[in-house]
């Protein structure tokens, strides 16, 4: 079978044509790539930043949020009050017995015409939503629906008490400060001192710093009886104190009349 022979110059011509076609396709592809690249390139502040479209939208949203937070001219007509003032408690704190154990500490509170005793985390009978959260030496912290309020022992008592025309309305606690004395969890008496600005003890047999072991028949080493003794001072005009002074127990009768200098009688007996 005869073999067809092509001229050599024709073969070279076809090879050059194929190379030219390939170059054309490469050029077209490069042009398309460059068009797409510059289409998705953002020129900002003289810098070329490549980022997808959704990233630009996110950046714009953050900028809009910043403008709304800092430069918005429209304010909420009905803003929500964060801290609303809670009415103050209408109670009278009459006494505090503080021990090293929070569970044995308690307070005496006047609610209406009655005096109540409360321990830590107890709710008030007159206000079931109010709880005792902390008992301090001279104050108590109450919580009412997340609002905390501190009530101080005898907050309205002036430094100097004016003497009334008659002492008939005054009680022993108007002239005597009784502070529980503790040794760890054990209470072993009440330390007695005159109220600031008063010279009440100069007209009685009491001396500043005296330690009372008993008041009437109440032992001041038991928390329950200490509570009753503090209540007695808040309601009575006279009482018998068992005082330990220089290691010697003494019985001293004390009255409002003696503390005000209106009564010259003094009663003391050494046990």
Swiss-Prot record:
Part of a cryptic operon that encodes proteins involved in type II secretion machinery in other organisms, but is not expressed in strain K12. Involved in a type II secretion system (T2SS, formerly general secretion pathway, GSP) for the export of proteins. Its main location: membrane. Coiled coil: none annotated. It is a single-pass membrane protein. This is Putative type II secretion system protein C. The chain crosses the membrane at residues 18-38. Belongs to the GSP C family. Induction: Silenced by the DNA-binding protein H-NS under standard growth conditions. GO terms for biological process: protein secretion by the type II secretion system. It comes from Escherichia coli (strain K12). Pfam families: T2SSC. NCBIfam families: typeII_sec_gspC (TIGR01713). Keywords: Cell inner membrane, Cell membrane, Membrane, Protein transport, Transmembrane, Transmembrane helix, Transport. It is found in: Cell inner membrane. Residues 1-17 are cytoplasmic. It comes from the Bacteria.
């Amino acid at each position: 079978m005869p073999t067809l022979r092509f001229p050599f110059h024709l073969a070279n011509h076809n090879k050059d044509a194929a190379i030219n076609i390939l170059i054309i396709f490469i050029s077209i592809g490069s042009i398309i790539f460059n068009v797409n690249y510059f289409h998705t390139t953002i020129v900002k502040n003289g810098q070329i930043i490549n980022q997808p479209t959704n990233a630009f939208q996110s950046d714009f949203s953050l900028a809009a949020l910043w403008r709304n937070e800092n430069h918005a001219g429209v304010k909420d007509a009905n803003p929500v009050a964060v801290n609303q003032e809670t009415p103050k408690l209408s109670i009278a704190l009459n006494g505090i017995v503080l021990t090293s154990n929070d569970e044995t500490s308690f307070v005496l509170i006047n609610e209406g015409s009655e005096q109540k005793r409360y321990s830590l985390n107890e709710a008030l009978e007159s206000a079931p939503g109010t709880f005792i959260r902390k008992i301090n030496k001279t104050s108590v912290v109450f919580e009412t629906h997340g609002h905390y309020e501190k009530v101080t022992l005898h907050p309205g008592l002036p430094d100097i008490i004016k003497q009334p025309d008659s002492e008939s309305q005054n009680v022993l606690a108007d002239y005597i400060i009784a502070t529980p004395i503790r040794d760890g969890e054990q209470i072993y008496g009440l330390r007695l001192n005159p109220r600031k600005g008063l010279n009440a003890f100069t007209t009685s047999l009491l001396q500043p710093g005296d330690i009372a072991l008993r008041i009437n028949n109440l032992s001041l080493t038991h928390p329950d009886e200490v509570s009753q003794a503090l209540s007695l001072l808040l309601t009575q005009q006279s009482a018998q104190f068992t005082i330990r002074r220089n290691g010697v127990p003494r019985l001293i009768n004390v009255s409002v009349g003696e503390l005000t200098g209106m009564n010259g009688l003094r009663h003391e007996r050494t046990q």
